Regions:
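Conserved beta/loop motifs at nucleotide-recognition and modification sites
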Residues: 1-224
Length: 224
């Protein structure tokens, strides 16, 4: 089943799936989606967590497969996270992921979360991805387009009780902000958090925003 990222919060309020697949090339949004799923799972008693990163074609999937079936009747519920940075699990991984997808159906003791980069059409039609999507919830995480970034910044400011001045000045402020972070959501996120520390809830002037983000650092997510 496919669920839009914007609808994830509503979905989690209704029900928690035993299997989630997050795929896309925006690290901040993927991390936030994973955090939301984890928080909901913890609130429902999933207290244990294990994480696996698939590095190369010779990855040993046996530990991942064993993790999902290792709980006894009286053990704590667990979250099993599988990261596949390349988006290519390989032949053994394809078989393993199909097994994981099948075992997830009706499983109320293990929540599995598979995290992938942006996938091409051929990969999405492959057997392993179809099995994951068919037995769980698939969430495609698209980047924020450059033209949408000012509005995204405004929404994030609103979440912490802040807003820019209304009218043309506010639009110039948001555009300046977007230009400074150069489309980097991680940088934008950190600058928005900085504004919450520097200024109380309420209206932000153009001068306040410019002073805060004028020297914004350039972040490379692969070096964090």
């Amino acid at each position: 089943m496919q669920v839009a990222l914007a609808q994830l919060s509503t979905h989690l309020q209704r029900a928690l799936s035993p299997l989630y697949v997050l795929h896309g090339d925006e690290p901040l949004l993927q991390q936030e989606a994973a955090d939301a799923i984890r928080a909901t799972a913890r609130a429902q008693g999933y207290t244990e967590r294990s994480s696996y990163t698939v590095a190369g074609a010779h990855f040993d999937w046996s530990a991942v497969l064993a993790a999902g079936g290792s709980l006894s009747l009286f053990a704590d519920k667990q979250i099993v996270e599988i990261r596949i940075p390349s988006g290519k699990p390989g032949k053994d991984g394809s078989v393993a992921l199909q097994q994981i997808a099948e075992s997830a159906r009706g499983n109320d003791s293990t929540l599995t979360m598979v995290m992938l980069p942006r996938l091409d059409k051929a990969t999405k039609t492959g057997a392993w991805f179809a099995a994951l999507e068919g037995n769980g919830v698939s969430i495609q995480i698209d980047p924020i387009e450059r033209g949408q970034l000012p509005q995204w910044i405004a929404q994030r400011l609103a979440q912490q009780g802040q807003r820019v001045v209304a009218g043309e000045e506010g639009q110039r402020t948001l555009q300046f902000f977007a230009d400074r972070v150069e489309g980097n959501l991680l940088a934008a996120h950190q600058e928005i958090q900085k504004l919450a520390l520097l200024h109380p809830a309420g209206e932000l002037t153009q001068a306040q925003v410019e002073a805060a983000v004028l020297n914004v650092a350039r972040y490379d997510v692969f070096k964090l």
